[in-house]
Amino acid sequence: MMLCDAHCHTAGISLCSRVPADQLVELFVQEGLGAIVLTNHYKRAHVRGEFRDWVKRYVDEYELTRALGEKKGLKVFFGVEVTPDEMTQNDFTIYGLTKEDVVNGPELYALSFDALCDFAHSRNALIYHAHPFRRTTPVDGTKIDGTEINCHPLYKTCAEKEVRAFADKYGLRLSCGADYHGDTYKAHCGMWIPKSIETTAQFVEYIRENKRPELCIAPDPVDPIE
């Protein structure tokens, strides 16, 4: 098995990130992880220039990170973190959209919550409510496929107990990631997945069939900033 951090960002797209792709890859390699899912922000406030040009850059940033990871022995899978205009306190990580879905698809942040879920499911993707207890409350769990234990050390707690209760109530999948932006130390956390997984499609099929993979959850920070 290998540890996969299912939530991280690079500065090339996520404007709140301080870490470029090469540094991100090097950090995860040094930490000993086998894989990551790059989930850069897909949010109206992060778009620079024309939308169609921006989504191409979004995909290019992933390809850059994937290529850098390949050279270092780190597998990099493709994900998206969408913040809908209608509910900007809520973020959703989507696993299973293709690069073509992102480049040719609608402006995902402009979709309603229901329409975003429908779009993800129409592409056979899985949609997770990221950090559902961070400055917000969980959405309707019947609409989504999973939720996340988020170990970003900027916040007081990963809310593991509450997230698990939410997941149990609706039979949701669970993921885990550090939400690393380079603004704090990198929490050691993630999901244990087979080393044989090589592609994003294989990763998505694994979490589709294994709703509750073993998680590595970082302890809550002793001195959070918030």
Question: How would you describe each model-predicted region?
Answer:
Residues 1-6, 10, 14, 20-26, ...:
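Charged catalytic cores and adjacent phosphate/nucleic-acid-binding surfaces used
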Residues 1-78, 83-86, 142, 161, ...:
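An N-terminally biased module of ancient metal coordination in phosphate/nucleic-acid-related enzymes
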Residues 3, 29, 66-70, 112-126, ...:
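Surface-exposed amphipathic alpha-helices with a cationic face
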Residues 12-16, 54-55, 103-108, 125-128, ...:
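Short, flexible loop segments at the rims of nucleotide/cofactor-binding pockets, characterized by
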Residues 18, 109, 123, 128-139:
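Active-site-proximal loop/helix segments of hydrolase catalytic cores
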Residues 37-38, 128-129, 148:
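Conserved beta-strand positions in the central sheet of alpha/beta enzyme cores
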Residues 90-124:
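Binuclear metal-dependent hydrolase catalytic cores centered on His/Asp/Glu-rich metal-binding motifs
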